[in-house]
Amino acid sequence: MHAKSSFWIVPALFFLAAAFINIYGNMKGLAIAGTVKPALLPLLAVTTLVAAGGADTRDTRRLVLAQLLGCTGDTLLLFTGFYPFIGGMLAFLMGHLCYISLFGGTSWKGFGLKTWIPALVIMGGIVAGLIRLIGVEGDLLVPMCVYGMVLMLLIFSGLSGVFRCRGNAWWLVLAGALLFTFSDALIALETFSEEPQRWIPATIMVTYLAAQSLLAAGALHIKKR
């Protein structure tokens, strides 16, 4: 799936403008940050569609679906409480699964149990360590463990692509997956911390938007064989 049109620059500029407003608003504690947040991923989705030349391939449709699920998660997390948080995380999880199906379908070809068993053990250990570090407990422990494993699979799909597939675009995928994990870890830290830090909201958005952009750029430049 390659970028086919240079007209993507126009919606990309709108996306960058909205991203700047959101990040600046988060830094200053302004309400406008929440106002523009639901528009961010739709603008990125439009950029993706224009760059790809339309939604005529399954890969493009999966990529755009992941972005729109991100928009759903963004919107739900504007509200406080247990159910908006769970709904937002569920939307993001479904988006991650779209990304995993998009990238892992290529980078995991030929993997057997000799690869998957140690990989899953390592990923499980990393998730357990992060969960313990952040201090997740109670009813959210199991859901967050599942969510963490999905993030590890996303990272693994990018890492596998870097070492097994041709093209520098896989580095974009890996970087996007790592930034997504860092951003989500900050969301968990903010949620479960008794004294959230003022710098966290803006940092979440910077890393999150960079992650979404890198995953989109990687997908658009990966040549499917």
Language-model features: locations:
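Polytopic alpha-helical membrane-helix bundles and their juxtamembrane interface segments
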Residues: 1-225
